[in-house]
Amino acid sequence: MTYKQRNTNQLAIDLITLSRFNRYNPLLATFSGVWATILAGSHKITHSPNSVTSEYVLSQALLCFICSFVFCGAGMVWNDWIDLHIDRQVARTKGRPLARGAVTTSEALVWMAFQFISSWVLVSWMLEGENVQAAMLPVTLSTILYPFAKRPIFRRLHIYPQYLLGFTLAYPSLIGTLAIKPEGNAQPLWASINQSLPMFVTVFTWTLYLNTAYSYQDVVDDQKMNVNSAYVLAGSYIHHLLVVLAVLVLGAVGWQLYGQESQWLWGGWMGVWTWSFLGQLVRFDKSRPESGGPLHKENFALGVWTVFVCVVELLIGGNGC
């Protein structure tokens, strides 16, 4: 009994590790939805003060956080299963539970299915059964395709895995927008898509930036295996690529904030991100691929900071001053 109990406990630990729940990475998948929910709620409170409460907005943001977190866990399992033969050859990934044989394929797939179904149920609850397929199917498809985009065949199509990852992490901005229903509940889906577009572009470009820097740590092994990736293509121009991506991110943030008309957001979001990006680009060293790791962590901190900025914007009633 003791031996079986020890195995059960170890399996639970390995499954948590498989979904990266022991690390901060899945939290990156929660930012776009949480930001979008809070800012949509802030906008609604500003223009219709009695239509919704801050408590309701924050409860919807929490649901969006949980949905995104759990869905990301399922995506991590799928990625490791498809990339199993690659992970076993890369120094940074060969210790993952599937790669080292700590979790069987059957166990991993059951765990993945449980997380996916849970996230679908939570999204349905949050959206009160409306637009659930529109919220879940596109991001599910991009998650399925993501690991395959690392194959050389996708290079011929000029499709890189960062594109699909960016789409996957940015798409919850639509879910967050849908979570705050407009007055009269009459807004069509296309209008919600249009409303969420600036946030989508912000998170999409931000993901390209931070993932390119982070994944550059594997550039030596990936070049040997001819892995399809933007940082492999960039080669010695990796620093130039990061500068271009940083400019695109800040431009997208400006687009998002232009519609918010908030001095607080301009200072707390745009100001802090601009200063941070300048420091990151100075510290990144293409001759030391490992320098991309700290940059990735700093961007996670920016994501957490921006949640705080959005919450303050909500609590001050969207006045931004």
Swiss-Prot record:
Subcellular locations according to the entry: Membrane
Encoding gene, per UniProt annotation: cle5
GO terms classed as biological process: terpenoid biosynthetic process
Key words, A-Z: Membrane, Transferase, Transmembrane, Transmembrane helix
Gene3D superfamilies (UniProt xref): UbiA prenyltransferase (1.20.120.1780)
Enzyme class name: transferase
UniProt cofactor(s): Mg(2+)
Role this protein plays: Polyprenyl transferase; part of the cluster A that mediates the biosynthesis of chevalone E and its oxidized derivatives that possess a unique five-membered lactone ring and can synergistically enhance the cytotoxicity of doxorubicin (DOX) in breast cancer cells.
Name of the molecule in the record: Polyprenyl transferase cle5
